[in-house]
Amino acid sequence: MHNTLFRTALLAAALGSFSHTASAEGVMVHLFEWKFNDIANECETVLGPKGFGGVQVSPPAEHKQGSQVWWTVYQPVSYKNFNSFGGCEAELRSMIARCNAAGVKVYADAVFNHMASGSGTATGGGSYNSGQYQYPQFGYNDFHHSGDITNYGDSNNVWNGALYGLPDLNTGSSYVQDQIATYMKTLLGWGVAGFRIDAAKHMAPADVKAILDKAGSPRAYLEVIGAGGESPDIQPGRYTYIDTVTEFKYGTDLAANFNGQIKNLKTLGESWGLLPSNKAFVFVDNHDPERAHGGGGMLTFMQGARYDLANTFMLAWPYGWKQVMSAYRFENMGTYETDKGAPGSTPCTDSQWNCEQRRPTIMNMVLFRNRTEGQPVSNWWDNGNNQIAFSRGTRASSPSTTRAARWWPRCRRSRPASTATSWGAMTTAAAVMSPSTAAARPA
């Protein structure tokens, strides 16, 4: 990793006087496995002041118990109780209000493809038994009974089969749709701005749209992992008529180039086979590929400084609705425990929490992105290998490198005379990756 050590420093003093001009959503951060009270504090002290536009929070519906593993929050038991791993209903509502007051929109992860497996008492006190298809709001007739998913080349098998054996809700049922829509409308009434739709590719697009329509058509981004050899009916492009869709290929393309030659990123966008920019929800990684779920090939926090640089590029480059991952470490005695739940400590108080959103390399680029929103790329420069620079319209330039040699590329500043005053204060509004001043950070 010695040849990829660098530091990204935004000239924050120059940018500090700029007002936020982000698009409606702005940059999202996924505070993975954070408690609601901690999220509220982060909105007020970091996310709002630094210009983040939104925060994704864990599914707030009551769910299967088991804080020692992270995935229990993705096994809901009912949609009428809001006591979850993140906190109680009062803490949830307080967090939403406080984040909104700080200028940070709240997007709730929503799981309604399936319900929890096993039996017992949920985090909100509800009883369930998956063997008998008994849940507080649902019974046997509210589920599909088509066995497990065995063939991703058959869309009906994917939509109606059980994912990892989890009871598959019949999302085509009006009753089921109404229960989920009521849950979503409750959250919207409390101030939630929208939803991430988990496992959307495992539901027919028409079902997802019907539920969202009944909920009042809130803003949503749908998790659809495209994969070669699978049915064309479950590819990301089949869901874009509903709303924004996760573009996992963006992350794998970034990784391939940051592990190769970043000069090729000059044309990154729809011409690479990616979704249209206004339909793409993009990230360097998220909680699934980080744990080798849902496909691999992405950079993660384990790649250290290279990962930071990829995030910096994502925030500087004009493509998609962007999300930064805020993760935690899950090593144990030299091995990776991918099921491991969040550390018991308060976020960002020890080394178990990564808190990527607080790193200057990433945090300061949010303001860069906000200030350059809507500006085209111009003045591209590269050295034919791993040093690049480009400007964003008349506002900013971003040089970067993945090599450890001292360099400072010459990049024309597109400074019109009419903006001399603001540019005089700005000097060089640039994200500067300076390997010569880099400090080693463990991968």
Curated annotation (Swiss-Prot):
Belongs to the glycosyl hydrolase 13 family. The record marks 288 as: Transition state stabilizer. It is found in: Secreted. Keywords: Carbohydrate metabolism, Glycosidase, Hydrolase, Secreted, Signal. Substrate binds at residues 114, 196, 201-202, 228, 287. This is Alpha-amylase. One of its GO terms (biological process) is carbohydrate metabolic process. It comes from Aeromonas hydrophila. Pfam families: Alpha-amylase. The gene is amyA. It comes from the Bacteria. One of its GO terms (molecular function) is cation binding. It is an enzyme of class 3 (hydrolase). InterPro entries: Alpha_amylase, Glyco_hydro_13_cat_dom, Glyco_hydro_b, Glycoside_hydrolase_SF. Its EC number is 3.2.1.1. The active site is at 198 (nucleophile), 223 (proton donor). It catalyses: Endohydrolysis of (1->4)-alpha-D-glucosidic linkages in polysaccharides containing three or more (1->4)-alpha-linked D-glucose units. GO terms for cellular component: extracellular region. Residues 1-24 form the signal peptide.
